[in-house]
A protein has these predicted regions:
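Iron-sulfur cluster-binding electron-transfer modules in prokaryotic oxidoreductases
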Residues: 1-132
Length: 132
């Protein structure tokens, strides 16, 4: 049922640090983001936030325990819906797709390391240091 290990392999080989959410919230026991079946619309916000609370709690756990600042998803609906839910439940948590994570990590020969992601947003950890 589904692809569980392949995305983890890609993520572990793309980012600096990888932490799993609690075991009872991942793989076959995962929680939905709460926005499937057309619920990713503004008028359904309260229902989306309630439905996404279990996922938000597991993200909050790794954020507080390990300082995780980004969650990567293979699901396009999660990628579209989680930023709003996590801004509410876990402020400051970034959301990316696995393909975005890989694209942002790729540095081709002769290319300088990126300071912004492919969307033009600052990459976490690559912000310019202010002059002291």
């Amino acid at each position: 049922m589904g692809l569980f290990e392949e995305p983890r392999y890609v993520i572990k080989n793309t980012c600096n640090h990888f932490y799993e959410m609690p075991e009872n919230t991942i793989r076959e026991q995962t929680f939905c983001c709460g926005s499937g079946s057309g619920l990713n619309a503004g008028e359904n916000m309260e229902l989306r936030l309630r439905g996404g609370l279990p996922r938000a709690n597991s993200v909050k756990y790794v954020h507080e325990k390990h300082g995780v600042n980004m969650v990567a998803c293979v699901c396009a609906i999660d990628r579209a819906a989680l930023p709003t839910a996590l801004d509410y439940w876990v402020p400051g948590m970034a959301v990316t797709g696995v393909h975005e994570l890989v694209g942002n990590a790729l540095i081709l020969e002769g290319e300088k390391p990126r300071e912004t992601n492919l969307r033009g947003e600052p990459l976490p950890g690559m912000e310019e240091e202010e002059d002291v």
